[in-house]
């Protein structure tokens, strides 16, 4: 059976809680049980195999800090796009989906998933080509958010955007030229927010599908932001516009 490895106490705990299929948990043999008591209880109640191993064993599984905990899990499953759209239409809320056009850095994707979960974004769309997939590096960087945010992997991003538009979404692209300050963005309708790659920005076909463009003003010496930072600003601007202070999102 194909499987991948995740490391870190929080990532492993979130995988158990979310119901993800876990084949085995590895615990560093020098870790005191009191430090991982919650994980051990969850593993026991879910009948998950737990194996005590030397630190070198876990070191060999990942270059990331692992806190003495790792797990072999089933591959991450991508959400079905058509089912996602139908589900969003059935809900009485303004939907937001993030569209990542050519993002290739797994740490950026993990960070974006983390912020998407925190800010109430409903789903993330990535293309099958020219894009990072859901890997253990993404899982680690997301600190467990990968278990909670639907990620859809599509063949044709431009066609997918057209389907979103047919279902009431307005598509907003991040673009420096001929665009509006993101603080003036209207968030009163279902939104698809496009984040282009750091090197190339949005592809031509995707850019042509956008309904309007926004920019993030910068007054310092640099002229660009990390993709995950730009995405975070956009997501929380939508959150700010839709949620008054003191209201529960």
From Swiss-Prot:
Signal peptide: none annotated. Its EC number is 2.1.1.-. GO terms for molecular function: RNA binding; RNA methyltransferase activity. It is an enzyme of class 2 (transferase). It comes from the Bacteria. GO terms for biological process: methylation; RNA processing. GO terms for cellular component: cytosol. SMART domains: SpoU_sub_bind. InterPro entries: Alpha/beta_knot_MTases, Ribosomal_eL30-like_sf, rRNA_MeTrfase_TrmH, SpoU_MeTrfase, SpoU_subst-bd, tRNA_m1G_MTases_N. Keywords: Methyltransferase, Transferase. The keyword Flavoprotein does not apply. S-adenosyl-L-methionine binds at residues 196, 216, 225. Belongs to the class IV-like SAM-binding methyltransferase superfamily. RNA methyltransferase TrmH family. This is Putative TrmH family tRNA/rRNA methyltransferase. The lineage of its organism: Bacteria, Bacillati, Bacillota, Bacilli, Bacillales.
